[in-house]
Amino acid sequence: MSRIKSAFERLNGEGRKALIPFITAGDPDAALTLPLMHTLVEAGADVIELGVPFSDPMADGPTIQRASERALARGMTLRKVLQLVVEFRKTDGKTPVVLMGYANPVEAMGLEKFAAAAAQAGVDGVLIVDYPPEEAAAFGAAMKAQGMDPIFLLAPTSSAERIAHVAEIASGYVYYVSLAGVTGSGALNVEAVAERLPLIREKTGLPVGVGFGIRDAATAARIAGIADAVVVGSRIIEEIEKSTAETACANVKALVADIRRGVDEVKK
């Protein structure tokens, strides 16, 4: 059983929802990424989404774009991201790690080579933002051949056909983008998300995570009431951005622990 599936089954048995925080690898620098990953776990993360920095992150708002720019300026690469996962796995063999990024770095390495290297490093799932599900058969097959979960985005604008297609090829969990925009944008309409999730659950038995626009414990609690997982990214990156190297881990831990408390207000 994959680490992702195991995590969701454990949480389901405990009557709890998953918390999935996102950070960008190499932001603010490579030396702090590993401590931040362990900090996320200490604060209550069930799965870590680790962003692979890219020069043109079209789905990301200004906050995560700046994180990518900082990481790239300090020399972060896809190979170095994988090495960070190797280091993480030396002391954490339980927490699932999902790489989230764009197609270009993966294709530059070669899909099969990337899949093998990621699996060997200890990656559990991969989400490529700019792979349309309809064109992702090779990606999905390559991930599954290496025992990893191909994870896909669904949005408020996703058609019934796209939802059905994602249900066929995805594993691990489905990531529902609660806003039709870039990360960190707009106000989250929880009622609109609640109306949309049953349409997704009609098509798939996979857990559904919801992200984009979740900034505090209260909103996390509301999303946890309707979704299987709460994904938080931009708010954590903001905390890193305004912290020093000395205070980043403590500040992120306090933020994520507070959001964890919000998520845990909800019982299945």
Swiss-Prot record:
Lineage: superkingdom: Bacteria
Entry keyword Transmembrane helix: no
UniProt GO molecular function: tryptophan synthase activity
EC code(s) of this entry: 4.2.1.20
Active site positions, chain numbering: 49, 60
GO cellular component, one term: cytosol
Annotated keywords: Amino-acid biosynthesis, Aromatic amino acid biosynthesis, Lyase, Tryptophan biosynthesis
One Pfam family in the UniProt entry: Trp_syntA
Cysteines paired by S-S bonds: none
InterPro entries named among the record's database cross-references: Aldolase_TIM, RibuloseP-bd_barrel, Trp_synthase_alpha_AS, Trp_synthase_suA
Catalytic reaction list: (1S,2R)-1-C-(indol-3-yl)glycerol 3-phosphate + L-serine = D-glyceraldehyde 3-phosphate + L-tryptophan + H2O
Signal peptide: none
Matching SUPFAM superfamilies: Ribulose-phoshate binding barrel
Pathway recorded for this protein: Amino-acid biosynthesis; L-tryptophan biosynthesis; L-tryptophan from chorismate: step 5/5
EC category: lyase
Function: The alpha subunit is responsible for the aldol cleavage of indoleglycerol phosphate to indole and glyceraldehyde 3-phosphate.
Family to which this protein belongs: Belongs to the TrpA family.
Subunit description: Tetramer of two alpha and two beta chains.
Protein name: Tryptophan synthase alpha chain
Species in which this protein is naturally found: Dechloromonas aromatica (strain RCB)
Lineage, top ranks: Bacteria, Pseudomonadati, Pseudomonadota, Betaproteobacteria, Rhodocyclales
Name of the coding gene: trpA
